[in-house]
Amino acid sequence: TMINGLGVLGWGVGGIEAEAAMLGQPMFLPQPVVVGVRVSGALPAGTTATDLVLTLTEKLRAHGVVGSFVEFFGDGLSSLELADRATLSNMCPEYGATAAFFPVDDATLTYLRFTGRGDAADLTEHYTKEQGLFRRDGDPEPVFSEVLDLDLASIEPSLAGPRRPQDRVALSNVWSSFVEAYRDHLEPGPKPSEIGRFVGEGGQPEPEEALPGGEVDPAQTAGEATIGDGSVVIAAITSCTNTSNPSVMLAAGLLAKRAVEAGLSAKPWVKTSLAPGSRVVTDYLDAAGLTPYLDKLGFGLVGYGCTTCIGNSGPLPDEVAEQIEERDLTVAAVLSGNRNFEGRIHALVRGSYLASPPLVVAYALAGRVDVDLTTEPIGHADGTPVFLRDVWPSPDEITEAVTQAVTAEQFRAQYARIFDGDERWNALDSPTGAMYAWDPDSTYVQEPPFFAGLDQADAEPTDVIGARVLVKVGDSVTTDHISPAGAIKPDSPAGRYLLERGVGQPDFNSYGSRRGNHEVMLRGTFANVRLRNELAPDTEGPWTTHLPGGEVTTIYDAATRYRDEGVPLVVLAGKEYGSGSSRDWAAKGPSLLGVRVVIAESYERIHRSNLVGMGILPLQYEAGSSASSLGLDGTETYGVRGIAGALQPGLQVTVDATRADGSVVSFPATVRIDQPAELEYYRNGGVLRTVVRGLLP
């Protein structure tokens, strides 16, 4: 989505859609609503493009732009450099839009020429001006379906969290937002994670005696680390969004320089890292002489690409992890990423905040979120308090650093060898031939079961009868909740699978790295450590209740039992189901577990498409209706009438929920198969089966 900042219209698709397109299937997109964002003013001193994009994400999520195109216009665009625009466009999935487009103007041409693409700039300028597409200040306003206003002068230093990218919070209110989100974990009494642990050890979700509780202990020493509730244990400069912006990256380096010169250092319990999205970043940090200061604070280069932002931070120091687990501490991460969904960053980190790279450095120095960085010191040097304002670089300093350190030659040199690879990459052996040779002993790649039985005709979809609810969740359940990409726990179904095959815990790697093995991925479905399944009250993690017996067990084990019993499965959800990453396994996994229907209040665009693409029927409650308003608790037996025979896009079907006492709640739901082609995919058991069947003689 970042290319939209350059005036190139593009949008993301699900992995299942992409696979189908590679095999010749057409792509379908309903005519979108186009929301215009009128931009005015300029960013105040002390604010960054990150503060702007977090404010925009909050604003657009509140307005509702799922499935819409967003287009920016107005004279305020002249104050935004191309890198700032790319930051806004790249975070488009977080506010739910299909695309976030900037028109071509002088800033676009300046960027193209600066990055060594002068010929492309000349052609772009000539073409867009001839076509009337070139933006100038004072142009007549385009016509949009809806228009919102964004005053850049109103932007303030911000973070977003601790659970969702749209939950923007002013810098001065970070601690209050943390307390509000985790009050139950910070106050005396049993915590959901403790109850979940007892369940995992064979206990009951409601023990006869209260679980150990009490006042939150004062911070205690773990090795050299003094940590407590609210401690920052991960501070990561990462993500394609922010590390592609020279202004915020050099601001982080300048802040690090001032902090080191003031005698400050990162707190010892904070795991710090730098993972830019481009090699050009380290080139200009080196050229500015700022790399040694970042290194001094622990922000050494760990690689280029997705790391902490997708859950690949690696383990915390042993003494820190032990304190978190033994005392059930509620700790935080601060990162310059796009996504901070629960359980995504690290299994031991409950709350995560998105922030600009310089604020990430500041929180590494402070080491905690129970601090107001606008009024309290970030640290002390020889007993003297040092405040954020003392080390924050001025706009002139940042501009000077960008001017002196960022050069066109850096881009040309890196682009020229972008596909070369290093010695280790080039030394890898790659298989040849038209057919892949499956290795039955591989724990990374296994032949998937999606094409089993293609020699037989698929049965027509039938009404759902006697289904049970596997998972019942609330609003904003993300694809990370459904199919996590991070670390695999040894006591999880996926971990036990790997151990049984001789894979030691140090070699578990992550769910994301093992997505070529369906046996791992179906065991990891709904395995997020922060999942709150209402069918297993007072727990967090991959738990559910097997019905009608009432046994609390893992979601994978319950699904296996239901499969053996011939019971189809249903998922009940709230609003924004499937938001976040366009993760195809968030649809493939539930399909393999036996989920036939999802009933939600609303869906994220790509996830809805992926569900259909895997043969799962997405149903949507009528406006104003929900599981709660209908009095559904998930223990009912479900039937869906209207699937057999006459199923059509947008059709209204009837859902019957039968309670244990025999009473029935019947309610209408809309079939969220939105295109005729999707109906064909659904009838064939999914898009992959449809495509492959079409290739067979």
Regions found by a protein language model. Give the residues of each.
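Mobile "lid/hinge" segments at catalytic clefts and subdomain interfaces of large enzymes
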Residues: 1-136, 151, 248-251, 256-268, ...
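Short helix/loop capping segments that flank catalytic or ligand/cofactor-binding pockets
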Residues: 2-6, 11-19, 46-48, 80-83, ...
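Extended active-site and interfacial segments that coordinate phosphate-rich ligands
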Residues: 2-35, 250-257, 351-352, 357, ...
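Non-catalytic terminal/interface segments that mediate subunit docking, oligomerization
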Residues: 3, 7, 150-289, 426-599
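Structural motif
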Residues: 34-36, 67-71, 98-101, 147-149, ...
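Extended C-terminal subregions enriched in glycine
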Residues: 269-291, 295-308, 312-314, 521, ...
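Acidic, glycine-rich flexible loop/linker segments
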Residues: 378-395, 607-681
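NTP/phosphate- and nucleic-acid-binding module
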Residues: 505, 509, 513-518, 523-552, ...
